[in-house]
A protein has these predicted regions:
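Amphipathic, heptad-repeat alpha-helical segments
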Residues: 2-56, 60, 69
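Carbohydrate-active catalytic/glycan-binding domains of CAZyme proteins
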Residues: 61-382
């Protein structure tokens, strides 16, 4: 696209979305804000800004992709449609890893606040957002509840919140990332879900001897979630890497256990045959006496497994939400970050499929358990 062609298209889209700027409904405001982010990022890339991040490639951060998506959304608005209906995010942002917790009949979701058109290492993911809903469709956005902090293990970025309630306290386990991208599991607590205090003893979990962790280089220890079993034992699951018997490293699920939510015992790390690239965003729950693990199988989508033991013995049940259509432009562009939960008597599963150009939204689908212990995904809530 030549410079003159670009600015003709840029001006055309801005003129066409102008009438929608006076609309006050959330769907229109969200879509217009997304269009603005797409065309403005395309403008900087077209002017010569480096589209990649600190670690290289930036799949989808091309003028053609960014402008193409903006054109699609603009045309939909003109046709009286909401192109992002059923896909929640704060206007102008991406919603990535997330965690649900119910309180007083309302559902709270906590999430990474990402940036459209920018990789995480270009415009930092350094705040955790918060929204509340009574129906899982209409969300009331709250103030961000946690941020990166100078001098701590999260002095660069904060990722992947996982919230769990126990004995009057809400525990948020999140990934603290330092400037070298050495990742650690950190903790913040709250009694009301709005005011959070970081634990002074952070970090609370690092990989065991089966892996490696170095403060001065990239080290995998992220995407934690905590499940409290019937006997009161809390189990933490997180994305990491372990030594292979024949040398080198492989992606793995790290597990730790605790009785007090602060002190954690290493329970090892486990690999999965079905996961051929990277395992991310684990989520564990108990159903009918069995333990179910849902996780992102990068390059493919959301997979799940079952076990009689909360630590090991996981047996694959296959893919649950697969990437459809064209193959993903990069392994991260798949349905991911799933959580399964029951709300007001109905089961649901969440997903946040990353689009080329770092668009990412929260989607919630109906979810059904079957008598044989398997599950299936139904229609999306809109």
């Amino acid at each position: 696209m030549s410079l003159s062609e670009f600015y003709l298209k840029y001006s055309d889209i801005r003129i066409r979305i102008a009438p929608f700027r006076t609309k006050t409904d959330f769907e229109t405001r969200k879509t217009v804000a997304i269009i603005d982010e797409l065309i403005n990022r395309a403008d900087t890339v077209n002017a010569g800004a480096y589209a990649g991040g600190r670690f290289g490639g930036a799949v989808g951060h091309t003028v053609e992709n960014l402008m193409g998506r903006a054109e699609k959304y603009t045309s939909a608005l003109e046709a009286g449609e909401y192109p992002l209906k059923g896909m929640f995010t704060e206007p102008g942002l991406s919603l990535i890893d997330h965690s649900f917790v119910e309180k007083d009949g309302l559902m709270h979701v906590f999430y990474n606040r990402g940036f459209i058109g920018f990789e995480w290492d270009t415009r930092y993911v350094d705040t955790i957002g918060h929204a509340v809903s009574a129906d899982l469709v209409n969300w009331d956005i709250q103030m961000p509840c946690l941020t990166a902090e100078r001098g701590g293990p999260d002095d660069y970025q904060t990722w992947s919140p996982g919230v769990v309630y126990r004995d009057g306290v809400y525990y948020m386990y999140y990934t603290g990332v330092n400037i070298h991208v050495a990742q650690t599991i950190c903790l913040a607590t709250s009694t009301d879900l709005y005011h959070w205090e970081k634990y002074q003893g952070n970090p609370v979990v690092l990989p065991g001897e089966w892996g490696e962790w170095h403060a001065d280089r990239w080290s995998d220890c992220r995407d934690s979630m905590v499940f409290v079993d019937d006997d009161g034992t809390a189990y933490m699951y997180y994305c990491t890497a372990r030594h292979k018997p024949d040398g080198g490293m492989e992606t793995a699920l790290g597990v730790a256990s605790s009785r007090d939510m602060f002190t954690w015992k290493d329970e090892g790390a486990y690999a999965f045959d079905i996961c051929d690239i990277t395992l991310e965003s684990p989520y564990v729950m108990k159903h009918n006496g069995k333990y179910y693990l849902f996780y992102t199988n990068c390059g493919h989508g959301t997979a799940y497994a079952v076990s009689d033991d909360p630590i090991c013995g996981w047996q694959s049940l296959g893919m649950l939400i697969e990437k459809t259509g064209e193959p993903p432009m990069c392994p991260a562009n798949v349905p991911s970050c799933a959580e399964v939960f029951c709300y007001k008597g109905q089961w649901y599963i969440s997903s946040a499929e990353r689009q080329p150009g770092c668009e990412q939204y929260l989607e919630i689908f109906h979810f059904t358990w079957h008598e044989d212990g398997t599950a299936s995904v139904g229609a999306r809530l809109e």
